[in-house]
Amino acid sequence: MSKKLHIKTWGCQMNEYDSSKMADLLGEYQGYTLTEEASEADILLLNTCSIREKAQEKVFHQLGRWKTLKDKNPNLIIGVGGCVASQEGKAIKDRAQCVDIIFGPQTLHRLPEMIEQVRRGEKAVIDISFPEIEKFDRLPEPRAEGPTAFVSIMEGCSKYCSFCVVPYTRGEEVSRPSDDIILEIAQLAEQGVREVNLLGQNVNAYRGATHDGAICTFAELLRFVAAIDGIDRIRFTTSHPIEFTQDIIDVYEDTPELVSFLHLPVQSGSDRILTAMKRGHMAIEYKSIIRRLRKAREGIQISSDFIIGFPGETKEDFADTIKLIEDIGFDHSFSFIYSARPGTPAADLPDNVDMEEKKQRLAILQDRITQQAMRYSRHMMGTVQRILVEGPSVKNPMELRGRTENNRVVNFEGQPKHIGTFVDVEIVDVYTNSLRGVFIRGEDEMDLRRSLRPAEILAKRKQDDELGVTQFKP
C-alpha cells in the first residue's frame, strides 16, 4: 500500500514552489505520493503565510480540523512549515499538541530526517533556522509539470520595510549560484518547459556566485536564461523599485524572451506614507523607472501591490495613490487593507484610520484598476496574440487555455496536440478575468527559434570530417 502525503499551501508563489519541492523530496527519498484528501494521508503538511492579519489563528483553526484525524490515527504525522512556523516556532507545539514537526522555509530540505526523528519517538522536532542556501543543494532534480515552471533564484529580503515580516521569517537576502539556476532551468527545458518564472522576495537584488568566483547580476542572469535552448518566455516575481537598475531595463530592450509585463510593487503613491513604510524611494522615482522601461519596451504593462489604510494615511495621501494609479495606468494590482504584523516597526504606530474608511478606499482603488485593466483588454479585441497553451480550459475541458505575454488567460477551441506549444489566436471577446480567442496558426507555421535539447544532440550520429572536426549528423 503506497504512502500518502497531503500538503495545504497558503500564500505567495514562493510557498507554492516550496510545497512542490516538499512533494518531490518526500516522493523521491521516501516514496510518498500526493493526495488531495487529508483523510487518506500518512503525513499532513501545512505551508503557512504570515503576511495577512490573523494568520496565526487561521493556522490553529486548520490544525484543529487535522487533530480529529490524528485522534483516529495516532500514527499520522502533522508538520507546520512556512513563515508562521518561523515566526511562532515552539509556540505552535505548545498550543497544538497534535503537531509533530515545525520547520521554516529554509529547512524544508531536512523533512526526511525530521520525519524519521518523529518515527523514532521524538515528541516535537523543530528546526526554523536559516542555513542560507543549503536547502537547494539537498533537493531532488526539478520535475516539470506542464510548459511553465517556477524557479527560485534567491531567498529572503534585506529591505526591512516597516510593515513587512519577510526579513524575520525568511531571513536576509541570499542568492543561489548562477550555475545552479541555469542547470535547473536547462533540466526543465529538457522536459518541455517553455516559460520560466524566476522567484524571490526581491529578485532584482540577485547577486549570485559564478563557477569562477565572480558575481552574476540579475541582468546578466536574465540574459543567460534567455540563451537556454527551449526557453522562449521569462517572467520574474517580485521586485523592489530601489534596485530596478538601468542594466535590468536594458535587458528589456534587447531580450525578446523577457515578457512585456512587469509586477513592480509600489504600495502607496504618497511620499509621506512611502517614507513611513521605509520603502527607500519617492513616487517620482517610481514613475521614472516606468518611463525608462516604456522607452526600452514600448507597450509593457505594469501591475503592482498597494496597502490601503497604513497608519496615518490621510485622504490626501490616498488621493496621491489614485493619481499614481492614473499616471502609470496599472493593468492589475494586489491590494489589501493594512494589518499590523507582530514584531514589525509599523505595528507600534497608532492605527488611526477608520475601518469603514479603509474599506471604502480599497473599493475605490480596486474599481479604478479594474476599469484600466478592462480598457487594456478591449484594446486587444481584433488583435492576434501569441499564447503559450497551458492545458484544458478550467470551465470547459473540451477547450484549451493559454496565456498572453501580458498575463491574460485566453480560452479557445483547439486540438490537444497544441498543449505545451505556442499558438496564435485572434481575440474576439473580452471578459473580466479572461479573453476569448479563435485559433489562427500553430507553432509549426511560425518562424520560431529552433532549439536543440541535449537529448536531441546526443541522438545524432557522431562523425569526424577529414580535418578531424567532430560533427553530429542526423
Swiss-Prot record:
Keywords: 4Fe-4S, Cytoplasm, Iron, Iron-sulfur, Metal-binding, S-adenosyl-L-methionine, Transferase, tRNA processing. Residues 3-120 form the MTTase N-terminal domain. Binds 2 [4Fe-4S] clusters. One cluster is coordinated with 3 cysteines and an exchangeable S-adenosyl-L-methionine. Residues 378-441 form the TRAM domain. Belongs to the methylthiotransferase family. MiaB subfamily. It is found in: Cytoplasm. It comes from Shewanella baltica (strain OS155 / ATCC BAA-1091). This is tRNA-2-methylthio-N(6)-dimethylallyladenosine synthase. Transmembrane segments: none annotated. Its cofactor is [4Fe-4S] cluster. InterPro entries: Elp3/MiaA/NifB-like_rSAM, Methylthiotransferase, Methylthiotransferase_CS, Methylthiotransferase_N, Methylthiotransferase_N_sf, MiaB_methiolase, rSAM, rSAM_horseshoe. Coiled coil: none annotated. Its EC number is 2.8.4.3. The keyword RNA-binding does not apply. Catalyzes the methylthiolation of N6-(dimethylallyl)adenosine (i(6)A), leading to the formation of 2-methylthio-N6-(dimethylallyl)adenosine (ms(2)i(6)A) at position 37 in tRNAs that read codons beginning with uridine.
